[in-house]
């Protein structure tokens, strides 16, 4: 790919973010509806956990292949292919039942998201100037899709039925083809020989722990926790709580990106990880204290800090691995986050019925805090 100007990088990043914003709702709404209505899809709760983890787990082996496809075929082709797979998968949720049929759709979406995610990270960091600002604005655009999708999906499911939600979301994904077509067509080179999963550095350890705790335990437990405390109108309450997570990303991600540009993305990532771990600890403490105020304080703290963290990994990776090493480093970081986020739902399904929530969320808090502190001692190359 020819070197982009700052304006071209801004425009390409914006289009890639719009593509992902239109495609994400079909996936995110599953995290709301599958745990609450497994019987509609002929599923058991363990099968729900498997399906919610499958799209992450397939990227463990698929991310490096998708990164090579992106590097050789370019953002436009990769994202057009991914949008097509997304549309098929989302419409499939309208028609199909049974764990094996749905598993195929989840694997298809997992690889599609890999391409969309690499495009967003790579284009945001394609020009060294203003990477944090560009990534923050992109995260804000991306988060708007799931925010509106969760709110609309909860209302549709309540009054029109669960299956109708995915028919609408499949239609919503179709305009993403237009924005994908406007992405740069030229491919970008990639450093050869990088293994799909190598020995993790400090950034990869942090990515794993963030995926395991914030994307796994916290997100999967969010709908269940809110529904347990709000039995009346559970789907609307859970949908609103999950939408708040993405709504705050719309507001806070651009602010976080600009803040990271001024103060240093690595420093802000460490500080935000520590405060997010405090929020997880509060969620666990609410189980002991019995106070709803403690629960909501923990949920809000974790949601806010997760939004702050979202745009920060890409500029930290770009700082640590400059030049052509950036793409494989981004793929490795995303792979380790997916490993954590894939194992998180599986662990949650086993831990919550057997172990007190205070212990589960306390362990999550310790993992995230430790991974954040480990970044203090690591240095850019």
Indicate residue ranges for each PLM-predicted region.
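Helix-to-loop junctions at the C-terminal end of transmembrane segments
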Residues: 62-74, 251-264, 352
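Central cavity-lining transmembrane alpha-helices of secondary-active solute carriers
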Residues: 53-67, 240-255
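Short amphipathic helix-loop junctions that connect adjacent transmembrane helices
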Residues: 32-46, 220-237
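Loop-to-transmembrane helix entry
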Residues: 43-54, 133-137, 230-247, 294
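Intracellular juxtamembrane helix-capping segments at the cytosolic ends
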Residues: 115-128, 308-322
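Cytoplasmic helix-loop-helix junction between adjacent transmembrane helices
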Residues: 107-142
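C-terminal transmembrane helical hairpin of 12-TM major facilitator-type secondary transporters
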Residues: 266-313
